[in-house]
């Protein structure tokens, strides 16, 4: 499994896989940008690609708090998230696409009896909508949301929650991420991490990932569960 670059930790002996969602399982970063733009247009406000890049991997609630403070909006963060999420869900229903190699990887994990979870900064309603639209709910033992933890990525909270629910040690978990914040969270949790940058995150620094691949198509699960090193 040839990587673009390799980190210091050997990717080996994987006993569970934890997937980020946005940018990893689905090509959603452009839709998040459009949702912010559509919602903030109601206030005659703009939201650019640089703004979206700064929010990649962060909890929706944290993003909302930042924007409310910046623009002095008279609403709570929960109200902001709820309204922006309505726009996002409409876009997901119309335009959502699964990333290349995802179905093959999930099916292989199922065949190998590797337990899997989603650990996303997104809200639980958004995660549930995605697995419904993509018809992948049967592949995941657990769904873990940024709603359920105190600290969002780059803190490790959501990944540690996933490991606890899966019943495995953090060191036995492989995280697949696409953002700098997500990789930081995975490594802070003591987990192995493969970064697969998406179009929106290809400019980010992934030197701290254990392995960087160009696509989910390059993930070879048979090798990951072996005790030998892939790095």
Task: Annotate each predicted stretch with a short phrase.
Residues 2-16, 107-110, 123-231:
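Asp-based, Mg2+/Mn2+-dependent phosphohydrolase catalytic module
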Residues 7-112:
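N-terminal helical cap/lid subdomain that shapes the substrate entry/recognition surface
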Residues 24, 28, 120, 182:
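Ser/Thr-glycine-rich phosphate-binding loops at phosphate-binding pockets of nucleotides
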Residues 36, 64, 120, 155, ...:
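Residue-level signature of catalytic and energy-coupling elements of molecular machines
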Residues 46, 115, 192:
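Residue-level detector of anion-binding/catalytic polar loops
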Residues 92-97, 121, 189-190:
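Short, flexible loop segments at the rims of nucleotide/cofactor-binding pockets, characterized by
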Residues 98, 119, 151:
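Residue-level marker of regulatory loop/turn positions in helix-turn-helix DNA-binding domains and
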Residues 117-118, 195:
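Hydrophobic beta-strand core positions in alpha/beta domains
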